[in-house]
């Protein structure tokens, strides 16, 4: 699922109140209303805003708002057409996500089915007057977590981020967990709905091979792909973070220079030399966990005396 990472402020002097978006329909958020009602019954009190959206505080009385929970800022199931869509269709999808997100916050701020305390908390936030001045204070970028990707001779898959984690041609390391947001919302025969596709699986640091960003020789010999690289959905869910993009971009730049200077195709460069240059520049290719700290005197005493018993006469 895609969403907008919202920058909001709780500074009254800098805050723009949430407004009703075009074609607003409160029943679009019916499941959110039912979720809030269920949370109230379960906890015996009104839910807080952080229960339906992730709030990461940043300086200047602002916060980064992201998806959190089964009904939040992710517009589940509405991103499917985007990767292969025309530019016109992509604009439609973009605006649909915009109006959904505006409606999400307006619903929380205005709808009578939302507990009063949650409405008040939502209304304490708003778009900042001093951000995104050229787009009516709305974020410039839709969070496109995953879109079109190259399919090369080597496709990085789940095993490459979980079990087969060393490679002969490493250009960096990844360590972010496999993080897939929900893919679709399914209506079940019993009348309930179920979100499908969310995945949060920890991984150990793994090596990223040069091969992920070189195309098939039959398709191109002068192209390097450091973002839309050759990876499955599960592998990409871990690789799709900015630190990995920066590592791959650095390696792509060096590889391009080596290809030009040696007059070779990107598939034929000296990868050993590429890896060596990356190491010289400080790129980490191996992970060695830090040794545990030495035990304290208190911990040593507990360990030594754990199985020792004393008679009453001892005291």
Located regions from the model:
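Flavin (FAD/FMN)-binding glycine-rich loop and adjacent Rossmann-like elements that form
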Residues: 1-301
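Disordered, acidic Ser/Thr/Pro-rich linker "stalks" and the adjacent N-terminal cap
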Residues: 296-315
């Amino acid at each position: 699922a895609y969403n907008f990472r919202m920058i909001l402020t709780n500074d009254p002097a800098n805050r723009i109140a949430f407004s009703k978006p075009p074609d607003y329909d409160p029943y679009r958020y019916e499941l959110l209303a039912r979720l809030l009602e269920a949370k109230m019954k379960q906890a015996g009190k009104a839910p807080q805003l952080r229960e339906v959206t992730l709030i990461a505080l940043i300086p200047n009385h602002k916060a980064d708002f992201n998806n959190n929970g089964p009904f939040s800022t992710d517009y589940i199931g509405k991103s499917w057409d985007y990767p292969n869509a025309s530019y016109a269709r992509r604009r439609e999808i973009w605006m649909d996500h915009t109006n959904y997100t505006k409606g999400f916050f307006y619903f929380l701020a205005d709808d009578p089915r939302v507990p009063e305390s949650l409405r008040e908390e939502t209304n304490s936030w708003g778009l900042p007057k001093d951000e995104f001045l050229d787009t009516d204070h709305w974020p410039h970028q839709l969070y496109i977590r995953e879109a079109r990707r190259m399919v090369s001779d080597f496709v990085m898959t789940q095993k490459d981020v979980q079990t087969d984690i060393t490679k002969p041609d490493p250009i960096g390391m990844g360590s972010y967990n496999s993080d897939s947001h929900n893919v679709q919302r399914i209506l079940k025969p019993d009348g309930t709905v179920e979100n499908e596709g969310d995945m949060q699986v920890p991984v150990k640091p793994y090596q990223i091979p040069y091969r992920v960003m070189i195309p098939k020789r039959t398709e191109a010999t002068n192209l390097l792909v450091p973002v839309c690289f050759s990876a499955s959905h599960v592998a990409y869910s871990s690789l799709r973070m900015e630190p990995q993009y920066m590592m791959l971009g650095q390696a792509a730049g060096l590889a391009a220079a080596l290809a030009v200077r040696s007059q070779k195709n990107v598939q034929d460069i000296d990868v050993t030399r590429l890896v060596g240059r990356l190491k010289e520049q400080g790129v980490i290719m191996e992970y060695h966990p830090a040794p545990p700290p030495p035990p304290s005197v208190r911990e040593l005493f507990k360990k030594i005396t754990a199985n020792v018993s004393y008679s009453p006469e001892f005291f």
